[in-house]
From Swiss-Prot:
It holds the Pfam family PsaA_PsaB. It is found in: Plastid, Chloroplast thylakoid membrane. PROSITE patterns: PHOTOSYSTEM_I_PSAAB. InterPro entries: PSI_PsaA, PSI_PsaA/B, PSI_PsaA/B_CS, PSI_PsaA/B_sf. The lineage of its organism: Eukaryota, Viridiplantae, Streptophyta, Embryophyta, Tracheophyta. The keyword Oxidoreductase applies. GO terms for molecular function: 4 iron, 4 sulfur cluster binding; chlorophyll binding; electron transfer activity; magnesium ion binding; oxidoreductase activity. PsaA and PsaB bind P700, the primary electron donor of photosystem I (PSI), as well as the electron acceptors A0, A1 and FX. PSI is a plastocyanin-ferredoxin oxidoreductase, converting photonic excitation into a charge separation, which transfers an electron from the donor P700 chlorophyll pair to the spectroscopically characterized acceptors A0, A1, FX, FA and FB in turn. Oxidized P700 is reduced on the lumenal side of the thylakoid membrane by plastocyanin. It comes from Populus alba (White poplar). This is Photosystem I P700 chlorophyll a apoprotein A1. The keyword Phosphoprotein does not apply. Chlorophyll a binds at M683, Y691. It is an enzyme of class 1 (oxidoreductase). Keywords: 4Fe-4S, Chlorophyll, Chloroplast, Chromophore, Electron transport, Iron, Iron-sulfur, Magnesium, Membrane, Metal-binding, Oxidoreductase, Photosynthesis, Photosystem I, Plastid, Thylakoid, Transmembrane, Transmembrane helix, Transport. Chlorophyll a' binds at H675.
Amino acid sequence: MIIRSPEPEVKILVDRDPIKTSFEEWARPGHFSRTIAKGPDTTTWIWNLHADAHDFDSHTSDLEEISRKVFSAHFGQLSIIFLWLSGMYFHGARFSNYEAWLSDPTHIGPSAQVVWPIVGQEILNGDVGGGFRGIQITSGFFQLWRASGITSELQLYCTAIGALVFAALMLFAGWFHYHKAAPKLAWFQDVESMLNHHLAGLLGLGSLSWAGHQVHVSLPINQFLNAGVDPKEIPLPHEFILNRDLLAQLYPSFAEGATPFFTLNWSKYSEFLTFRGGLDPVTGGLWLTDIAHHHLAIAILFLVAGHMYRTNWGIGHGIKDILEAHKGPFTGQGHKGLYEILTTSWHAQLSLNLAMLGSLTIVVAHHMYAMPPYPYLATDYGTQLSLFTHHMWIGGFLIVGAAAHAAIFMVRDYDPTTRYNDLLDRVLRHRDAIISHLNWVCIFLGFHSFGLYIHNDTMSALGRPQDMFSDTAIQLQPVFAQWIQNTHALAPRATAPGATASTSLTWGGDDLVAVGGKVALLPIPLGTADFLVHHIHAFTIHVTVLILLKGVLFARSSRLIPDKANLGFRFPCDGPGRGGTCQVSAWDHVFLGLFWMYNAISVVIFHFSWKMQSDVWGTISDQGVVTHITGGNFAQSSITINGWLRDFLWAQASQVIQSYGSSLSAYGLFFLGAHFVWAFSLMFLFSGRGYWQELIESIVWAHNKLKVAPATQPRALSIIQGRAVGVTHYLLGGIATTWAFFLARIIAVG
């Protein structure tokens, strides 16, 4: 029997009025740094101001003060999110054709922006159907609003106003919790309490209230909409909530109230809490009754999880105990000391959260098309492509951010004197083995995946199709992926006997869902072409990981620069007199990792865009014949590099290149402008600091001659600043180019 010491009572931990609110201080640029607050001597000042404004570590070394600043900043972030959401809902209320779309979502496109007619700009307002002229939007908000049961633009207005109120509330909270009642450090470090509140409150009660909204508001309203009832005739949300008889007409078991729940006769509720699988043939989205059931189940899980950790009462898990008990026969001290790292280094904490959130965002990207959650989402090809692309980019950036903050943790917060033989120390001690093996994997994947394509290009060029790797010659079938697909396709009759269809139509079988003559989803065939491009995915992902992981593991020291930790997170080179030590800082690894992340995600979204147009999206005739947008050319065309260039990039760019004079012309201009932004980045990436400093001094001389020289001395960008500006424009230009290319294409043909 273990006798524990009595648990200390947890007190409310805040400091009252710790920092006075001062607008004078606020208006003084760089008030957080003695050097920057002096004002500008050279133009470098403005760059340092931006670089350090949010680097709270550089303002103070007091962890409590840093924690308070981060906490307060989070409220500011939430305020901006509410403001953005309010703007989206306001556009839906004021400038959109939402009510018209709701009455006929298969023939009318969503639009929530009308361009003012200045010198011919009204050309941008295309006809989206139903006599409405505007810009077709691809954010998926209309589908989301329909799923939540919004039936009028007035409801959107009210929600927009509500979001503004919340934005103001968040701004107030950010000020209040920094200036009036700021939490003490112990409050930020009380992980069990935080877990309980986030799990039970945010995720548990959040999911439960959403499930409640779906059952009492969304389901009945959507049932009416699916039956073709005019939105104006449907009772309002509060009528369903207040009047049980209304719901009982649609779902008879509602008449029994909570009796079946307390008598454990839960199957009574299976009218509106279903387990069907597959898609609703009317809307092409997941069954909303399945979604409500899912949120109820998730809520139960998180409500239970939110009661697992030990706080004021002496029962439940302690995170420190769990981590310290977590050691195996080959892992030394295991996770001993990890608790201290995660409660004193917010960079370490943020790194883990970014890695998990980034991975989750990419999982969301895939689920949005494989299991389209909202009504009429699957047949809105522009929105499907946009949602996939958006979530892939966001996921990529978050994962690079995880590596960035892991490296900052290593440089600023890691204390090697207190860490011995725990898992992190063991990883650091055999980092050479890890990185060299990972490097070997990258070389193997790169040569072999690219080599398969080069072989195909060569055979194709020489007129020897029978010697190519393809579904019709030398087959390289993705047998493991096909096996997984098949297993899931058979699951409803075997491992999931309660389900009537598999989780996603993409797995296989002979189901096809079409809405209004357009394919929503069908089984996605995988073949040699997918096998080839998946190995390119493996290659680009592994190289990205190699660069980022090397940056983290060698952030403090390396054979080349043993004292790297003293140089900080970002530095250009190891001082003058030591050649060959440039681009070794942890920051530089993040910089280089961003380019490979861009490579990796680009291949993924290109693959997705072409695959869906070739093998999934299209129209279906009355006889049941499916005609795909690009006629199934992916399997034979994408197996050569030339095929990617000719049949994807060039063939599908015709819409954006020929968009002038049409409502898509803005995409043509963006395509051009984004190429320019991308090319502009090369000026920063391919030139050194000295070149620009020389040029600047010549220009300053001319200004002096004319007596118009500024008081602030102009300076060339530092090496790091130049790289930062370069990578920013590279990514912005590349992503915006892809965006214009994708949207002009899919809006024209989809």
